From Swiss-Prot:
The active site is at H117 (pros-phosphohistidine intermediate). Its cofactor is Mg(2+). This is Nucleoside diphosphate kinase. It is found in: Cytoplasm. Its EC number is 2.7.4.6. Major role in the synthesis of nucleoside triphosphates other than ATP. The ATP gamma phosphate is transferred to the NDP beta phosphate via a ping-pong mechanism, using a phosphorylated active-site intermediate. Homotetramer. GO terms for cellular component: cytoplasm. The keyword Kinase applies. Keywords: ATP-binding, Cytoplasm, Kinase, Magnesium, Metal-binding, Nucleotide metabolism, Nucleotide-binding, Phosphoprotein, Transferase. It catalyses: a 2'-deoxyribonucleoside 5'-diphosphate + ATP = a 2'-deoxyribonucleoside 5'-triphosphate + ADP; a ribonucleoside 5'-diphosphate + ATP = a ribonucleoside 5'-triphosphate + ADP. InterPro entries: NDK-like_dom, NDK-like_dom_sf, Nucleoside_diP_kinase, Nucleoside_diP_kinase_AS. The keyword Nucleotide-binding applies.
């Protein structure tokens, strides 16, 4: 099994609900280690840059507006098959379609306010982790 790193963001809706610790418990219980973390109020430029891949999609403006609506908790997770494991923990993008017991089923309100972001591939994970963390801010353990 490959040790991977992935990016996770606890979005403004979940931060406002004060469930960061409950979400972190899901990561750690699944064998993922938090190797970097910071709370941050994203600027519009940061959110637009991070989600640039969606720039031409109709939901882009609403997504950016949501991501700058309050602080987010950003973390790099590390572990065996971290990308897939985190995606399984998150559940489907639409919380109404997410399996019971997943983060989105338990903490998300809607497809827009869906509690968490997670990298969708090992390649994107490397890009996303580097977007928010310098190598010196990451401590493998």
């Amino acid at each position: 099994m490959a040790i991977e790193r992935t990016l996770s963001i606890v979005k403004p809706d979940a931060v406002a609900k004060n469930v960061i610790g409950k979400i972190y418990d899901r990561f750690e219980s699944a064998g993922l280690k938090i190797v970097a973390a910071k709370m941050k109020q994203l600027s519009r430029a940061e959110a637009e840059g991070f989600y640039a891949v969606h720039k031409e999609r109709p939901f882009f403006k609403d997504l950016v507006d949501f991501m700058v609506s309050g602080p987010v908790m950003i973390q790099a997770l590390e572990g065996e098959n971290a990308v897939l494991k985190n995606r399984e923990l998150m559940g489907a993008t639409d919380p109404k379609k997410a399996e019971a017991g997943t983060i989105r089923a338990d903490f998300a309100e809607s497809i827009d306010a869906n509690a968490v972001h997670g990298s969708d591939s090992v390649e994107n994970a490397a890009i996303e982790v580097a977007y928010f963390f310098a190598a010196s801010e990451i401590s493998s353990r």
